[in-house]
Amino acid sequence: MSISNSIRAQIPPIHPEGYPFIGAFALVSLILFWIFAPLGWIGTLLTVWCALFFRDPIRVTPQREGLVVAPADGRISMITRALPPAELGLGDRPLLRVSIFMSVFNVHVNRSPVAGRIEKIAYRPGAFINAELDKASEDNERNSLAISTPHGKIGVVQIAGLVARRIVSFVREGQTVGAGERFGLIRFGSRLDVYFPDGTEVLVSEGQTAIAGETVLADFDVAVPGLTFRSQ
């Protein structure tokens, strides 16, 4: 492998959702260079940051029924019991919830935590308060998915934040998804909540760093040995 190929192999691809933003930053940078060179360099740095924000690295997802993987990169900010969004139809009792906070420096492509069928997708407009606050799950703009699995339904909620103002979904109701498959993206910082069926025990703790499609949040079949992996 040539040096150039080796370098390219280390650079993660950019998600197409980012192309318009990167192009806009690059155009502004060129204009700033023409006006005042130091401003142009600042614009260039912002363009590079924008490209990094929309990076979409390949992830190696463990493939075994019963595993629940992280749907987002970020820090596990909260593990608690909470009522799931009413629009998902997951019941009116509190469920175990794991919240992952994504800063503006994390990868923001979201991945399905499980293999299953998307039973419900529900978008709800709302506010844009700090996504780290507990009340953000109730007050902020959100896009919720209910995914049916042999172990019960999993709720996945994309929550907009203080900076994030656009939730993007790549999937539709009735679609079958694989664990680790890309299902959406949130622009510029946000949060993902995962709601688990009763009886689930999570394998992570608050403050832990999660990697989308790779970090195992829970295992419904802890007694089943053997894992295979799939890059995607």
Swiss-Prot record:
BP terms from Gene Ontology: phosphatidylethanolamine biosynthetic process
Catalyzed reactions: a 1,2-diacyl-sn-glycero-3-phospho-L-serine + H(+) = a 1,2-diacyl-sn-glycero-3-phosphoethanolamine + CO2
GO molecular function: phosphatidylserine decarboxylase activity
InterPro entries named in the record: PS_Dcarbxylase, PSD-A
Cofactor remark from the record: Binds 1 pyruvoyl group covalently per subunit.
Principal subcellular localization: membrane
Entry's localization field: Cell membrane
Pfam families named in the record: PS_Dcarbxylase
Chain positions found as Pyruvic acid (Ser): 190
Membrane topology qualifier: Peripheral membrane protein
Marked site (Cleavage (non-hydrolytic)) residue numbers: 189-190
Entry annotation: catalytic residues: 190
Keywords, alphabetical: Cell membrane, Decarboxylase, Lipid biosynthesis, Lipid metabolism, Lyase, Membrane, Phospholipid biosynthesis, Phospholipid metabolism, Pyruvate, Zymogen
HAMAP family documented for this protein: PS_decarb_PSD_A
Name under which the protein is recorded: Phosphatidylserine decarboxylase proenzyme
